Amino acid sequence: MRKTVSLGDILLYIYDFAVIDARMYMLRADGAALIIDPNENAALLPDLEGVSRAFVYLTHEHYDHISGVNWLKSKLPCDVWCSEICASRLGNIRENLSKTFPFLFLQDKEKYDYVRKELKLPYTCVADHTFAEELRTIWHGHTLYARKAGGHSPGGSLLLLDGRLLFGGDSLLGNGLELKSLGADREAYCTEVLPYVHTLPSETIVCPGHGEITTLGELLPVIEAYITA
């Protein structure tokens, strides 16, 4: 799947991961690309025409959100950013869940066989730049603000673009799975994720790691109904 969504002056490209409903996002500006949670997806390549360098951001360390890092680096120069904790776990096949990824498909033989045969597992990659608590920078006229946000995973973080577009990874899903992963931490979620997103306007657009784009106003009541139950 590949689709584009126009968000005012921003054209957002959305791609899925072949075997699981995980999202890779891309924005273009001035011959550059901002790519969030890359996977190995041939549909991305034509959209990278004219791009000389990519700013790559990882919302957390789980395999389905990092699986395209090495592939992307083989295609063009990249600067890969993530939290320090995320970076420390990218090289551990247990902590990045690539060792156990095939087990997600034990009930679907076709997908299980595909994963075991076609995907490069187990998998590791390396980040080029990290931040401890927060990152503030300008990317081709767009403001980027990232902050550490554990809960779903120890290395989780949130990325806010221009104060209105929030890439939440698996921290903001609305399907009850935010705290169902190995290493999930309810206390961290309630102290690092929820207080921050409550400071943002309800019309903030949320681009989740799985599922469809929504707004904080629509998503937060759903999440809080089961997180704080």
Regions from the PLM with identified roles:
Residues R2-E49, L158-G169:
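Conserved beta-strand hairpin/beta-sheet module of binuclear metal-dependent hydrolase folds
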Residues V5-L12, Y114-L119, W139-T143:
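Short Pro/Gly-enriched beta-strand edge/turn motifs at strand-loop
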Residues I10, V51-A54, C78, H142, ...:
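A structural micro-motif
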Residues Y15-F17, V126-D128, K148-G150:
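Short Gly/Pro-enriched turn/cap motifs at secondary-structure boundaries
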Residues A33, R136, T143-T228:
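Metallo-beta-lactamase
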Residues A33-I36, F55-L58, K148:
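Short catalytic-loop micro-motif centered on adjacent basic/acidic residues
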Residues E40-N41, Y63, C86, G151, ...:
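Short, glycine/acidic-enriched loop or turn micro-motifs at the edges of active sites
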Residues N41, L45-R136, P221-A225:
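Active-site HxH/HxHxD metal-binding segment of metal-dependent hydrolases
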